[in-house]
Swiss-Prot record:
<dbReference type="GO" id="GO:0160147">
    <property type="term" value="F:tRNA pseudouridine(38-40) synthase activity"/>
</dbReference>
<dbReference type="GO" id="GO:0031119">
    <property type="term" value="P:tRNA pseudouridine synthesis"/>
</dbReference>
<keyword id="KW-0819">tRNA processing</keyword>
<protein>
    <recommendedName>
        <fullName>tRNA pseudouridine synthase A</fullName>
        <ecNumber>5.4.99.12</ecNumber>
    </recommendedName>
</protein>
<dbReference type="Pfam" id="PF01416">
    <property type="entry name" value="PseudoU_synth_1"/>
</dbReference>
<dbReference type="InterPro" id="IPR020095">
    <property type="entry name" value="PsdUridine_synth_TruA_C"/>
</dbReference>
<comment type="function">
    <text>Formation of pseudouridine at positions 38, 39 and 40 in the anticodon stem and loop of transfer RNAs.</text>
</comment>
<dbReference type="GO" id="GO:0003723">
    <property type="term" value="F:RNA binding"/>
</dbReference>
<dbReference type="InterPro" id="IPR020103">
    <property type="entry name" value="PsdUridine_synth_cat_dom_sf"/>
</dbReference>
<dbReference type="InterPro" id="IPR001406">
    <property type="entry name" value="PsdUridine_synth_TruA"/>
</dbReference>
<comment type="similarity">
    <text>Belongs to the tRNA pseudouridine synthase TruA family.</text>
</comment>
<feature type="binding site">
    <location>
        <position position="109"/>
    </location>
    <ligand>
        <name>substrate</name>
    </ligand>
</feature>
<dbReference type="InterPro" id="IPR020094">
    <property type="entry name" value="TruA/RsuA/RluB/E/F_N"/>
</dbReference>
<comment type="subunit">
    <text>Homodimer.</text>
</comment>
<dbReference type="InterPro" id="IPR020097">
    <property type="entry name" value="PsdUridine_synth_TruA_a/b_dom"/>
</dbReference>
<keyword id="KW-0413">Isomerase</keyword>
<feature type="active site" description="Nucleophile">
    <location>
        <position position="51"/>
    </location>
</feature>
Length: 262
């Protein structure tokens, strides 16, 4: 049978999602816990391979197993064998043609900025601290230049392995919740570091160093060296993955749970 899981994790102490030799990854910890429940080796496939320090509240994985377990056992049993910073949120049996990555039609990320003069000792690895005042409204206006299908070479990491820089951004919203600025972006897919590169360029606009039209200009240049540096990893969350309704993938609160809109 094939099982899909919803996964939440704090990526602070992991070297990204993907299993690697000699370093700890989220995938490694999850597979070890699932293998205990299944009493057999389990390999998982994820919707999005997040980088070192990046978090997930809406990650989706699937795996195949011959072990017959109640769905709640894949949740409670796995959680009992996971570290505190990784958790299974739900489990469903899915059809054989489901694939966590290739069946996905969209992914959604949130980047959380703690915009305050002084840093906080709470959630130091769960938000990115920027001490200078940011105009979130200008950031939002600038972000609208990125909507639709475009060549995102200006916001693509040099080591990106994707065959094409073209992506389709469905929405990009910037809002303020108290001292938190939330950059919420959804696209069919993302090139490597795309969200973090966009965010740091939007911060340039929010701080007043660049006009809102600068984002439109950057997009047209298709040159990564002209955009801002890559934003810090700790503010980024994979919050949702979209699938066709026929797969029956549950919908949950986007997170992270400290935001008021949850």
């Amino acid at each position: 049978m094939k099982i899909a899981l919803g996964i939440e994790y704090d990526g602070s102490r992991y070297f990204g999602w993907q299993r690697q030799d000699e370093v700890e990854s989220v995938q490694q910890k999850l597979e070890e816990a699932l293998s205990i429940v299944a009493n057999a080796p389990i390999e998982v496939f994820c919707a999005g391979r997040t980088d070192s320090g990046v978090h997930g509240t809406g990650q989706v994985v699937h795996f195949e197993t011959q072990a017959i377990r109640p769905l709640q056992s894949w949740c409670f049993g796995t959680n009992a064998n996971l570290p505190d910073d990784i958790a299974v949120k739900w489990a469903v049996e899915v059809s054989e043609d489901f694939h966590a990555r290739f069946s996905a039609t969209a992914r959604r990320y949130r980047y959380i900025i703690f915009n305050n003069k002084l840093r906080s000792a709470i959630l130091p690895k769960g938000v990115s601290h920027y001490h200078y005042a940011l105009d979130h409204q200008k950031m939002h206006v600038a972000g609208q230049f990125l909507l639709g299908e475009n060549d995102f070479s200006s916001f693509r990491a040099a080591k990106c392995q994707s065959h094409t820089p073209w992506r389709n951004v469905h929405h990009l919203n910037v809002s303020r919740l108290g001292n938190y600025i939330v950059v919420d972006i959804q696209a069919n897919a993302f090139v490597h570091h795309m969200v973090r590169n966009i965010v740091e360029s939007l911060i340039e606009v929010g701080q007043g160093r660049q006009p809102v039209e600068w984002i439109q200009w950057l997009l047209a240049q298709r040159d990564r060296t002209l955009a801002a540096p890559t934003a810090k990893a700790e503010g980024l969350y994979l919050v949702d993955v979209h699938y066709p309704e026929r797969f029956g993938i549950p919908k949950t609160a986007l997170g992270p749970l400290f935001l008021a809109d949850n």
